[in-house]
A protein has these predicted regions:
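FIC/Doc superfamily catalytic core
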Residues: 1-220
Length: 220
């Protein structure tokens, strides 16, 4: 299916229109996963005029982050931690960087702590350095790229390196990794709609690896 999509994209004369349209749709859906809700109408209006709707601004920041990441990957053929930091900075409009303070926990809808990510700043830096190598060094792992993408996504979300924007940054990394591997020429895969449709299963799959080592459900 990815090869089919890649072939179809090559027949479209104006890639910028396609990138702009699909990045806004992906941005809207990715943000909805984290309950940042806006309408397409709001987005297209905000794309051409200044407004103060915070939800629209967050979604537009996602679209800008995705496009910025795509340009980096296309030009440098790498996706390094310094690039991931730039993408998250675009999403959150701040320079907080990787977490340095303890206290971050993931809670469910009942306000119960379901996962505590690494708290020590040096451990976070070491884990992200390891992930950077896994993303960019083909000799580090010879797994199929789609399997690697699932592992990268799990590792990033479990390290949870930022104070905020981890989910959205992680979903941008998914798309950029497919571009990096040559499976996509443009960042036009609309992954977040699928996650919205299977949101409970998505979070269960991530948690299943943490609690039971169940990689199969996440990867498949």
């Amino acid at each position: 299916h990815l090869a089919e999509l890649k072939g179809v994209v090559k027949t479209i004369p104006n890639e910028q229109i396609l990138i702009n349209t699909l990045s806004l749709q992906e941005a809207k859906s990715s943000s909805e996963i984290e309950n940042i809700v806006t309408t397409h109408d709001d987005l297209y209006k905000e794309n051409i005029m200044i407004d103060t709707n915070p939800a629209s601004k967050e979604v537009l920041n996602y679209a800008k982050g995705l496009k910025m990441g795509f340009e980096i990957v296309r030009n440098e053929r790498l996706l390094l931690n310094k690039h991931i930091l730039l993408i998250q900075e675009q999403l959150e409009a701040n320079k907080a960087g990787f977490r340095t303070q303890a206290g971050t926990k993931l809670i469910n809808s009942y306000n119960e702590v379901v996962y505590t990510p690494p708290q020590d700043k040096d451990e976070i830096l070491n884990l992200m350095a390891n992930l950077e190598k896994f993303i960019n060094d083909p000799e580090f792992s010879e797994l199929d790229p789609l399997t690697k993408m699932a592992i990268i996504h799990y590792q990033f979300e479990s390290i949870h390196p930022f104070y905020d924007g981890n989910g959205r940054t992680g979903r941008i990394i998914n798309i950029l990794y497919l571009v990096l591997q040559g499976l996509l020429d443009l960042p036009v895969l609309y992954l977040s709609r699928y996650i919205i449709q299977h949101k409970t299963d998505y979070y269960k799959a991530l948690q299943g690896v943490r609690t039971n080592g169940d990689w199969e459900t996440l990867i498949l």
